[in-house]
Amino acid sequence: MTDLLVKNCLLSKNKDPQDILIKEGVIKDIASKITSDNLPTIDADFHFVTPPFVDSHFHMDATLSYGLPRVNKSGTLLEGIKLWGELKPNLTADAIKERALKFCKWAVARGTLAIRSHVDVSGQNLVGVEALLDVRETMKDFIDIQLVAFPQDGLLRANCLDNLNTALDMGIDVVG
């Protein structure tokens, strides 16, 4: 875990600059003039420090797929769902993982600490589940990822309930 001292931070609740002491990845103290000899130190140079962002509803299995298989010309949800149905049979775990990792790195670099992502479990296979479980493991030191089994085509479709249960057995967190 990370030990760090961040000096000269502007916070929303304090008029004067504050220092932030982080031990084992957890904020242990916020005060003016914290001293520590052996910690890596960052000077925030009187910039504003905010809590991290949380993305509470995302579809990481579809991230960065603009134009695949074609552009959603109407911009509507219905056309987007239709396009997803066209793309889904051609998805691979590697392609989903590559795009999701790229997105996660982008999100972390911009201050996101947690993502709740839906993953479609209504296809013939669970490539999205497989890929996003890998992504969650790969990124666990940088971002918290909660995975939601999402039966896009409905629970009553063939094999969907079985897929849902299998996804939960594989490590998906919740259903939604």
Which residues does each PLM region occupy?
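N-terminal metal-binding scaffold of metallo-dependent hydrolase/deaminase domains
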Residues: 1-36
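Short loop/turn motifs at secondary-structure junctions
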Residues: 5, 16, 108-111, 171
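Short, acidic/polar
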Residues: 95-106, 156-166
